[in-house]
């Protein structure tokens, strides 16, 4: 019995569900029950009947699942799989901003720690951030940790005043305008598709901007045959499954989030077999963080 069959057998025996983000390696995406972006997976984790969730992603995703469903066992196969951007936001810094802007609503990207979520009014993802900001009555918004997503939403909601945290995704931030222009010159008629975690200069030369799920939907529904995909290359697995006749180009030929790529089938199998790497959150902290995630599902549409 190969490891894939072992995982499927074990999953059935334990009554577990496997969730995987689009940035996971293809083998993990293929064995998962659900593959999606952060918002979609958070909804699945909240609503699923299974009491054991194996979350193949990074730590903040598994923590969000536990915050929403404390009665469920949430396993993160590789505990070291963190998020550099999430670590850029601190409780102390946010508390100071809240003191300086007492009338502002705090909107935190889901790519943030449980501690930051606990100090926030509402959480958001790249796919629902605009809806959430529009649904807030307050005009002043503290947005963290991603300055790029924040500035993108600011452009979409000009009636709001944003105080942006100076955080960013190291994978998306590394992309330079010159590389995109080079690819455009080399491939006539190519469409440029970017994640809002990209810098403004990249967004400004893109044909479409959206979350991972929105990127996949856009490409799947497009009659165009060539695309520059400016996000973590894990999305290519889904794009190639749905568009075998289409050509995809990644800046520099490589956009990899090392944390997202840590989880292997062996890690998945062993964590489920041994029931290791369970997410544990202090109940007082969880309740505070729960409010921001509850509001996300309420206001996110």
Curated annotation (Swiss-Prot):
Subcellular location: Cytoplasm
Endpoints of the signal sequence: none
Enzyme class: transferase
Keywords: 4Fe-4S, Cytoplasm, Iron, Iron-sulfur, Metal-binding, Pyridine nucleotide biosynthesis, Transferase
Gene3D superfamilies: NadA-like (3.40.50.10800)
Gene Ontology cellular component annotations, sorted alphabetically: cytosol
Binding positions for iminosuccinate per the UniProt entry: 21, 38, 109-111, 126, 195-197, 212
SUPFAM superfamilies: NadA-like
GO molecular function, one term: quinolinate synthetase A activity
Binding site for [4Fe-4S] cluster: 83, 169, 257
Keyword hit for Iron: yes
Reaction(s) catalysed by this chain's protein: iminosuccinate + dihydroxyacetone phosphate = quinolinate + phosphate + 2 H2O + H(+)
UniProt cross-references to Pfam families, sorted A to Z: NadA
Coiled coil location: none
Paired cysteines (S-S): none
Superkingdom, taxonomy of origin: Bacteria
Names of required cofactors: [4Fe-4S] cluster
EC number: 2.5.1.72
GO BP: 'de novo' NAD biosynthetic process from L-aspartate
HAMAP family: NadA_type2
Function: Catalyzes the condensation of iminoaspartate with dihydroxyacetone phosphate to form quinolinate.
Recorded family membership: Belongs to the quinolinate synthase family. Type 2 subfamily.
Name of the protein: Quinolinate synthase
Source taxonomy: Bacteria, Bacillati, Bacillota, Clostridia, Eubacteriales
């Amino acid at each position: 019995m190969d490891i894939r069959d072992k995982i499927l057998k074990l999953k059935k025996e334990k009554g577990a569900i496997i969730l995987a983000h689009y940035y996971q390696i293809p083998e993990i995406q293929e064995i998962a029950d659900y593959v999606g972006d952060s918002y979609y997976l958070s909804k699945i984790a909240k609503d699923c009947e299974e009491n054991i969730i194996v979350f193949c992603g990074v730590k903040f995703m598994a923590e969000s699942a536990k915050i929403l469903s404390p009665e469920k066992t949430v396993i993160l196969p590789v505990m070291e799989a963190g998020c550099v951007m999430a670590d850029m936001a601190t409780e102390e810094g946010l508390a100071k901003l809240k003191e300086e802007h007492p009338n502002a609503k705090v909107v935190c990207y889901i790519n943030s720690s449980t501690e930051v979520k606990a100090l926030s009014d509402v959480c958001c993802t790249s796919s629902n951030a605009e809806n959430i900001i529009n649904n807030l009555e307050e005009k002043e918004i503290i947005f963290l940790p991603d300055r790029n997503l924040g500035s993108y939403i600011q452009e979409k909601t000009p009636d709001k005043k944003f105080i942006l945290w100076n955080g960013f995704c190291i994978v998306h931030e590394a992309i330079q305008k010159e590389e995109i222009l080079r690819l455009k010159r080399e491939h006539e008629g190519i469409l440029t598709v970017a994640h809002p975690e990209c810098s403004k200069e990249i967004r400004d030369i893109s044909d479409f901007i959206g979350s991972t799920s929105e990127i996949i939907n856009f490409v799947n529904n497009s009659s165009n045959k060539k695309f520059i995909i400016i996000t973590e290359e894990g999305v290519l697995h889904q794009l190639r499954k749905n568009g075998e006749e289409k050509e995809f180009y990644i800046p520099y030929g490589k956009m990899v989030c090392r944390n997202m790529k840590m989880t292997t089938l062996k890690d998945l199998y062993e964590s489920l077999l041994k029931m290791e790497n369970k997410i544990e959150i202090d109940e007082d902290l969880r309740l505070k963080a729960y409010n921001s995630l509850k509001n996300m599902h309420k206001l996110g549409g």
